[in-house]
A protein has these predicted regions:
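Short amphipathic alpha-helical segments and helix-helix/interface helices
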Residues: 13, 118-123, 176, 180
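A general structural motif
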Residues: 17-19, 129-131, 157
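Short catalytic/ligand-binding loop motif for oxyanion handling, primarily in non-cytosolic enzymes
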Residues: 30-34, 39, 67-74, 141-145
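Phosphate/oxyanion-binding active-site loops and adjacent basic polyanion-contact surfaces
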Residues: 38, 77-81, 110-114, 118, ...
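A metal-dependent, Asp-based hydrolase signature
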Residues: 41-103
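Short, acidic loop-to-helix structural element flanking the phosphoryl-transfer center
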Residues: 75-86, 90-134, 146
Length: 186
């Protein structure tokens, strides 16, 4: 396994050497949630709610539904975290919604870790003075994502582009069109 990883690392380093602009995806690439499935974060939020005597029956279902609902009513290609919690607010009230939102961000931060292999690749690109960007289809804010990157040792990159903040996504390819213009890529 280690030999395969070293071989893959060398292959990626060769590609980095041939390019000036290096991009990384964020979730499930540079950063990992230290849970089996991403939605398990909502189970952990639920546990924290119980500890605070704010038990919300079926929170995970409500949270998944709220995200789906926010996506279905959005006029943009991607949504923001606040869009999800505006839907939740209608179910649980404004005060509780704000508390739950803070808990979810805290749980995200606690269970997000650097992917050691990608961190090694990032460090190599940085050592070669490459222009490094991060791109993600994600509802969490750029500010929050940047704090997670910093906490996990990703420093010295050029920029972070988040679909929720920009209202365009990688999935539609509009993010790439935007980046091509923004970064003057031929």
């Amino acid at each position: 396994m280690t030999q395969n990883m070293d071989s893959e690392f060398s292959r990626i380093c060769n590609m980095i050497d041939e390019n000036e602009l290096i991009s990384f995806d964020i979730y499930d690439t540079a950063l990992l949630r230290n849970v089996l499935n991403p939605a398990d974060i909502f189970d952990l939020v639920s546990l924290e709610l119980k500890k605070r005597n704010m038990n919300i029956t079926d929170f995970k279902k409500i949270r998944v539904w709220a995200e789906e609902k926010a996506r279905s009513i959005s006029q943009k290609e991607d949504i923001q975290f606040d869009d999800i919690y505006k839907i939740i607010e209608n179910k649980v009230g404004k005060t509780r919604s704000k508390v739950i939102q803070e808990i979810e961000l805290s749980v995200e931060e606690k269970f997000t870790i650097a992917n050691p292999f990608i961190k090694r690749v990032f460090d190599y690109a940085k050592s070669k003075k490459k222009t490094i960007i991060f791109i993600s289809d994600m509802y969490l804010s750029k500010e929050f994502i940047c704090s997670l990157l910093k906490k996990n040792g990703y420093n010295g990159y050029f920029e972070v582009y988040i679909s929720g903040d920009l209202g365009i996504s990688k999935a539609s390819s509009n993010m790439y069109v935007f980046l091509k213009e923004q970064l003057n890529i031929d």
